[in-house]
Swiss-Prot record:
Disulfide bond sites: none
UniProt-annotated location(s): Cell membrane
Record keywords: Cell membrane, Membrane, Transmembrane, Transmembrane helix
Keyword Cell membrane: yes
Transmembrane segments: 34-54, 58-78, 93-113
GO cellular component, one term: plasma membrane
Coiled-coil positions: none
Topology in the lipid bilayer: Multi-pass membrane protein
The protein, known as: SPbeta prophage-derived uncharacterized membrane protein YosW
C-alpha cells in the first residue's frame, strides 16, 4: 500500500511547493514532512525486513543499518531546505549508497553473500 503511494510523493510535494509562496510552504512543512516520511518508510520497511531475515550475515545487517540511518537523515534535509538553508549532498556517500543498494539487491536475488 505504501509502495503504491510512493510514486505520487514527489508530484504532491512539487505541486505544494509550486503553488505556494515561501510563507505558505513553511506553514505546509508538516504536510511535506508526512509525504517524505511515507516515502522513507516505504524504503526502510523492506530493508529492515531483509536485514532481519538474513541476520546471519553481518555485512547485510550493517548495510541495512547504514541505509536506514542515511534514509532518515535525508528525510530531515527536506525540512532544512524549507527553512531556507542550503543543503549540500556528499556525492561519494550518495554513490556508495546507490551502488551498495544495487549490490545488496543482487546478493538477495542471486544469494551471493
Amino acid at each position: 500500500m505504501i509502495m503504491r503511494g510512493e510514486s505520487n510523493t514527489y508530484i504532491k510535494v512539487k505541486s505544494v511547493l509550486d503553488n505556494s509562496t515561501p510563507e505558505d510552504a513553511k506553514r505546509n512543512k508538516n504536510l511535506i514532512y508526512l509525504f517524505t516520511l511515507l516515502k522513507g518508510s516505504s524504503l526502510i520497511i523492506p530493508l529492515a525486513y531483509n536485514g532481519l531475515i538474513m541476520h546471519e550475515n553481518i555485512l547485510i545487517l550493517c548495510w541495512t543499518a547504514f541505509s536506514v540511518i542515511y534514509t532518515v537523515l535525508s528525510m530531515f534535509k527536506v525540512l532544512d531546505v524549507l527553512e531556507g538553508e542550503t543543503v549540500s549532498h556528499s556525492r561519494y556517500i550518495y554513490l556508495a549508497y546507490v551502488f551498495g543498494n544495487l549490490i545488496f539487491a543482487l546478493s538477495i536475488i542471486f544469494h551471493i553473500m
